Regions:
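N-terminal beta1-alpha1-beta2 submodule of the flavodoxin-like/Rossmannoid cofactor-binding fold
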Residues: 1-96
Length: 96
C-alpha cells in the first residue's frame, strides 16, 4: 500500500486550511493510500531551538534524537503533502 505523510500546520480547527487538510486526508484514504496524518500543533511540536540544543548543534546524534520520530515518519512515506497557510508572504513559524 502506498503511504503518504500529510503534514498540517495551522492552529485553528475552523480554518480554511483545516478544511483543506480534511479533504486531502479523506481523498487519499478513499483512493487507497495509507495516511500518516501529522498535525504539528496537535502533537505539540516544539520548533524553537533551546540553548542546550544550540550548544550541541554540531553533535549529530543529539540533534537527530530530538526529531527522530518525525524523521522516521518521513522516511516511511512514499509521498509528502504539506497543508499550511501563507502568512505575511511565508509559512507558519512551526514549519521553520
Amino acid at each position: 500500500m502506498t503511504r503518504a505523510l500529510v503534514l498540517f500546520a495551522h492552529p485553528c480547527p475552523e480554518s480554511f486550511s483545516a478544511a483543506l487538510h480534511a479533504r486531502v486526508v479523506g481523498t487519499l484514504e478513499r483512493r487507497g493510500w495509507q495516511v500518516d496524518d501529522c498535525d504539528l500543533n496537535a502533537e505539540n511540536f516544539q520548533p524553537v531551538l533551546t540553548e542546550t540544543e544550540r550548544r550541541g548543534y554540531h553533535d549529530d546524534p543529539a540533534n537527530i534524537a530530538a526529531v527522530q520520530p518525525y524523521v522516521q515518519r518521513l522516511r516511511a512515506a512514499d509521498a509528502l503533502v504539506m497543508v499550511f497557510p501563507v502568512w505575511n508572504f511565508g509559512y507558519p513559524a512551526i514549519l521553520k
